[in-house]
Amino acid sequence: TKYQLQTAPGVALMKNDPASIQDAGNQGFIQDASFATTDDGGTGGASYDNTGHAKLVGVLNGFFFIDNTTKKPTFANNVAASQAFGTNPNTGSTNGFAFVNNDPFQEYICKADAAISQANQNALAYNCNNNDGSNKDGQSVVTLEIGSNNADTSMFTVIGTAEDPENEDITAAGCNVKVVMAAAARLYG
């Protein structure tokens, strides 16, 4: 689904990061929820708490904007903080679009930063680690923050291993796990 993306966002946006809609400041625009402080001044990343901050709408899946230098339509995996867009000749707007996977039951693969106990699968919700602006080819490199979990206020629920033979041991840091947006953290569904 397309969401409005403000020109010159306060923090970067990266493909595969959790997303929410700004509920203060420039209300209604999409924002990356993996940074410690989000565009609307809320708390994201490892300290995210859905009781006082914008709920998740999904996971970022790419961006479209008019490049401010070349004036060409651009599809990208990320948008840098403070990146200004050019004026769209079709709409007259300097805003762009973010494409978001917003199915509340969509499963995602995420790398855990620590071991996960079998008892905590399907029981607790976890946040992602704070995004510090690092990326791999424009895509997110954040991991699931296993040290902070709360079934009522965190972002994602682990539903199983990713069945990746080289990375499916949940007793080891770096295992790949399947997650869904935690029911209490999502705006839709």
Q: Where are the predicted features?
A:
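Surface-exposed, low-hydrophobicity beta-strand/loop segments enriched in small/polar/acidic residues
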Residues: 1-189
